[in-house]
């Protein structure tokens, strides 16, 4: 189980294995929408994401690539990783399908060949492999700002009602 699951379960490893899937379903959900529902694409957005810009512009970025991801808005940690599962996009094309299946399979097989070297953080650490293993990966961060309740305190609110979100 991930570090977060062990932490939330107060060190109970068996309980951690169970609760890890509570917040790590984006991979399976995305794969299911592409593979079983045959949707043109899937844009997964966590319910607790805060946007600095109108989130409807996310729709405009579908042509930027087959796989879209966002960076964490906290200082880099090897446990949490560079990217965040808060917003993930897959197009129903060769690269998008392969990547969503890869991500789902990593989560379902905790002994996969990447888990030890990359860590897991539920399903989040595998996002670091997307630009390495797949083509047409783009980052939304250059276009739309985002935060979540757990990262709000790490950012500066400026007098002109802007939020500094440089990292």
Regions found by a protein language model. Name each.
Residues 5-12, 76-82, 150:
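Short, charged, surface-exposed secondary-structure boundary motifs
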Residues 17-18, 75-76, 161-166:
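Short, P/G- and charge-enriched loop/turn segments at secondary-structure junctions
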């Amino acid at each position: 189980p991930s570090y977060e699951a062990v932490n939330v379960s107060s060190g109970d490893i068996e309980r951690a294995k169970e609760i890890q899937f509570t917040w790590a379903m984006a991979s399976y959900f995305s794969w299911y929408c592409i593979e079983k529902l045959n949707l043109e694409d899937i844009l997964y957005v966590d319910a607790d994401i805060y946007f600095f810009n109108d989130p409807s512009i996310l729709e405009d970025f579908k042509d930027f690539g087959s796989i879209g991801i966002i960076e964490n808005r906290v200082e880099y940690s090897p446990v949490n990783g560079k990217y965040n599962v808060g917003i993930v996009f897959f197009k129903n094309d060769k690269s998008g399908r392969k990547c969503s299946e890869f991500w789902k399979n990593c989560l379902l097989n905790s002994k996969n060949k990447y888990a030890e070297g990359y860590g897991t953080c539920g399903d989040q650490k595998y996002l670091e492999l997307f630009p390495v293993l797949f083509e047409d990966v783009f980052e939304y961060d250059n276009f739309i700002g985002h935060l979540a309740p757990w990262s709000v305190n790490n950012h500066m609110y400026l007098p002109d009602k802007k939020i500094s979100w440089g990292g």
